[in-house]
From Swiss-Prot:
Protein name per the record: Eukaryotic translation initiation factor 3 subunit H
Top-level taxon: Eukaryota
This protein's GO CC annotations: eukaryotic 43S preinitiation complex; eukaryotic 48S preinitiation complex; eukaryotic translation initiation factor 3 complex
Function: Component of the eukaryotic translation initiation factor 3 (eIF-3) complex, which is involved in protein synthesis of a specialized repertoire of mRNAs and, together with other initiation factors, stimulates binding of mRNA and methionyl-tRNAi to the 40S ribosome. The eIF-3 complex specifically targets and initiates translation of a subset of mRNAs involved in cell proliferation.
Primary localisation category: cytoplasm
Assigned protein family: Belongs to the eIF-3 subunit H family.
Record-linked Gene3D superfamilies: Cytidine Deaminase, domain 2
Native organism: Pyricularia oryzae (strain 70-15 / ATCC MYA-4617 / FGSC 8958) (Rice blast fungus)
Length: 363
């Protein structure tokens, strides 16, 4: 492995529809336990083509020792992509794929997530492991909770070159982060995902008869003047469910997770502030000791005696070790992820609340 990491030319990811179905089935069947696996395919200049996937065996919670909780089983499942047994399993399966003349190049791995909660230390370590072996390796994240609402959530990520360099040096101190200008926004790079179907499947989809049109399509006015000039024609099949005023349960859960991440962020911030107070006290003690030793040496010099060593403070005082800022960066990145989800969820809710407010106000 090279000492420096080169910038990856990968700009987008193409995933076969069959692979999407396999990943979705594996993640949903393992829910709420994290599901992980390997993805194989090929890289074509700036495009990664994912043509197959391999499920990693996970620890059955029922067979785990009684002293282990379900959280421990999830932690083992999250660390599965870099375990020695699964790496041997991956190599053996890729060997079998190569024997039947199938794309057998490991291009990354995939994992399941719940409500966008995937920016963890296990995710970073897994992706770093794959990128050390292959700089073009990617990570596919399938959000089971979002996908259960009839909207596929499949995203592709990789670690930035700057973050990989900092992770290799393991220097996540305040001074180093200020020098390299590395922030939580520079941890992950998201790439667009394109679902690819075979020509046979595409032909079949085009042969499926489309549903009959129910009246003319409603045109949404673009301005208030257009609305006053041409009133909107209400379709004969109004969607009453869209007027439901109940708050989306996913919005409530995301807000709870957002508050937990903010609390974890403030805990990390308090730990760093405690370190700064400890460092200030120790440096004040060292400064006082050096001033006292300087006065003693001046008196000894006047008495024509040998001066005492000035570096003895290194043995008497021990400066506190600065805690790593990596956890704080991951928490900040997760807070940003939750904030984007809340922003997306509140679009419909805010419109409903304004509609209710307008109907309650008297003219």
């Amino acid at each position: 492995m090279a000492d420096t990491f080169k910038e990856s030319p990968i700009k987008s990811v193409q995933v076969e529809a069959l692979v999407v179905m396999k990943i979705a089935k594996h993640c949903s069947s393992s829910f709420p336990t994290i599901a992980t696996g390997s993805i194989v395919g090929m890289d074509n200049d700036t495009l990664v083509e994912v043509t197959n996937s391999l499920n990693f065996p996970t620890v059955d919670v029922a067979n785990v020792d009684s002293h282990q909780s379900e959280r421990d089983a999830s932690a083992q499942a999250a660390a599965a992509p870099r375990s020695k047994a699964n790496l041997m399993y991956q190599a053996e399966m890729i060997k079998h794929l190569r024997e039947v003349n199938v794309d057998a190049n490991c291009v990354g791995w995939y994992t399941s997530a719940t409500m966008g909660n995937f920016v963890t230390m296990s995710f970073i370590e897994n992706q770093a492991h794959y990128q050390r072996e292959n700089p073009k390796a990617i990570a596919l994240v399938h959000d089971v909770s979002r996908s259960s609402q009839a909207s596929l959530s499949l995203r592709a990520f990789r670690l930035s070159t700057a973050f990989m360099t900092a992770l290799k040096e393991n220097k996540f101190t305040t001074e180093n982060l200020q020098k390299t200008k590395l922030t939580y926004k520079d941890i992950l790079i998201e790439m667009p995902v394109v679902i690819h179907n075979s020509h046979l499947l595409t032909t079949y989809l085009h042969q499926i008869p489309s549903a009959p049109a129910a009246g003319s399509e409603t045109t949404i006015p673009t301005s208030l003047a257009a609305l006053q000039r041409e009133p909107v024609n209400i379709p004969p099949y109004p969607s009453i469910d869209s007027l439901e005023l109940s708050i989306d349960p996913f919005l409530e859960k995301t807000c709870d997770l957002l508050l937990d991440s903010i609390e974890a962020h403030y805990t990390d911030l308090n730990n760093h502030q405690y370190y700064q107070r400890q460092m200030t006290r120790e440096q004040a003690k060292i400064t006082a000791w050096q001033a006292k030793r300087k006065a003693e040496n001046a008196a000894r010099a006047a008495a024509k005696q040998e001066p005492l060593p000035d570096d003895e403070w290194k043995r008497l005082f021990k400066l506190p070790q600065e805690p790593s800022r990596l956890e704080g960066m991951l928490n900040a990145r997760q807070v940003e992820q939750y904030s984007k989800q809340v922003d997306g969820f509140t679009a419909n809710v805010s419109a409903k609340m304004f509609a209710v407010r307008g109907s309650l106000l008297t003219e």
